[in-house]
């Protein structure tokens, strides 16, 4: 049967199964009987029955487990499912859980064509075995479904229509009006980075300085400082710009936190416990997060530092549990403090939060100039970070790895949502309940309240999103009704939050003209490819976001309208570029790009349009190249000859690592957070993540282009990457703009990859070194099989030993 594209939203309710025989009842198929020569028996013990929802082989939902109801399990669970899948059937799979995995009971198939009219379908569907024969007793599952095609979404392709836009539906945290946001590009912006970017109302964009603001927030806190991080390092300074000194600015972060705790401020830290940081491997762990060092530094001090494992969904099998707690992480990066009121003279305090991609650790301090060699005797002499070369060290010289990242400061009601996230996590994994009781300080710390008036041109509406589950946080709704309303989904026993992926999908479906996406890992798990490799069902989350992007472009091509997506990636994922893991990720990345380009080229051909697909979807990376200057730092040693390290040092070039996780839509809506576009970040039961989505209600792209802070931030980023400002860049959806950016990036790549360079690279934005064939296949850019100075293939290579769970 031919597949039908379901692109929209699917509402599903799973009620119950009737006449089910479980426990010790034999459930088997003829094919399995022939293979195993004995019947397959459900696990003995307490039956734990659950059901999952698949669109063909893509897993899109799962119920909680029902215990001690082996004959008539009742879930009454509802699901709000974003879909963009070619499918034949909606499949309901019923299983009995056991410690190793789960035992299949049967599957029920509902043909997709029954849903296409958009009418509600409420029926009992027969459960079949693997040979498509009815299981014993003729068991059926009661389900209700209704499909809403994307064209029925009132926000589809219209952007944010008005200031009354309610935010992303079915989420744990509602959208909060009356907020204020500071947007940060990189950890620091020096005074000589001064692009003149006009905004509406005769204003000009003014950049903010992340680590200066974090330093001030910690220094001025009087009651509490709460921090979570993938890594938190104690031996580095937040303030390093000698032209912008601060009193006490040379203090190390660890010393500053101890000082505040000794003053009576409640300092609590949740730091990911890297299980590889043990003596059998190496003390700082495979990821070099310094978690053990940080814990030891604060031991017996007034700072409460807790190392917390990423515990798995409790319903997982034993093997899955060991896997998740070892390879998945706590990836949220937040700081929450009490702060002074914005108006002087008040003794009251308020809550201020920081959310984004920058950890408080070594290797993160950088500026928009991203120097490779010229800061090695100043800002980066004691903070030399270069994990892409074996044996790299400051004593051997550069290039260091520059770090491009994005962060935000949140004020107003949304700051309290970040605080509540920390409190949920602390109560689950923090040990002693030593959270500050803010009710006892209600005369001092004001409750959640707007910090701007509705008619203030600079007011923001902000919403907080997460990937997390009950293994990492307390206080989620427990009833199916409450969970569905909050957009929560079930693990086998845990409630899971996946609102970050919902936010991205919701944002992708709305815009009219353009996307700018920065992400450190961008993967579409290529469902068919995984099926061939693993012969198994797989989750849909990592597939859907890139597919939504390509479907969006296709819809615009079919409507005869302009639309452009700009994606900025790291040249390769951080690590040794020839390694199996990096090459496997690059292979998945190539497949993702290829899937998207095939969709676009097919649409162009179907509509008789002869145009470069890079006018609609274009990929970039960042890099720098510097000529040597007199007075530069001279290392006392040299890298080993004929290595990536020595070649990069000789050619004076290296990638700028893109760690940012950000999307800008139509210059009116922005998402900033910690999550990558991959399975582990979007799943909810793997890496824990946090993000915010925001817009300014007085700066929307309704009748004319938006010219608020988001536009200014986007133009400032482009100035950082391109080294120029141009009127063409103000309209990113236009053919003139995308061709200008592509032309400049092509030129910069040629300069970056050339044998010699007489001057500094004039900008950092490089064409991602791939070519697109006539049918959409992603191929090598001529002469670029390997990344410069390496023997690492640009297109990557499929790993024969690393499972996709590690590389997607």
Swiss-Prot record:
Signal peptide residues on this chain, from the entry's feature table: none
Domain PLD phosphodiesterase: 326-364, 654-681
Family: Belongs to the phospholipase D family. C2-PLD subfamily.
Originating organism: Spuriopimpinella brachycarpa (Chamnamul)
Broad class of enzyme this protein falls into: hydrolase
Known role: Hydrolyzes glycerol-phospholipids at the terminal phosphodiesteric bond. Plays an important role in various cellular processes.
Active site: 331, 333, 338, 659, 661, 666
Listed EC numbers: 3.1.4.4
Catalysed reactions, as listed in the record: a 1,2-diacyl-sn-glycero-3-phosphocholine + H2O = a 1,2-diacyl-sn-glycero-3-phosphate + choline + H(+)
InterPro entries found in the cross-reference section: C2_dom, C2_domain_sf, PLipase_D/transphosphatidylase, PLipase_D_C, PLipase_D_fam, PLipase_D_pln
Cofactors demanded by this protein: Ca(2+)
Residues in C2 domain copies: 1-125
Gene transcribed to yield this protein: PLD1
Domains (record comment): C2 domain is a calcium-binding fold, and the binding promotes the protein association with membranes. A lower affinity toward calcium can be anticipated for PLD alpha due to the absence of two potential calcium ligands.
Keyword field: Calcium, Hydrolase, Lipid degradation, Lipid metabolism, Metal-binding, Repeat
Record-given protein name: Phospholipase D alpha 1
Gene Ontology terms: biological process: phosphatidylcholine metabolic process; phospholipid catabolic process
Source superkingdom: Eukaryota
GO terms for MF: calcium ion binding; phospholipase D activity
Residue numbers binding Ca(2+): 186, 370, 404, 720
GO cellular component: plasma membrane
Residues the record lists as binding a 1,2-diacyl-sn-glycero-3-phosphate: 331, 659
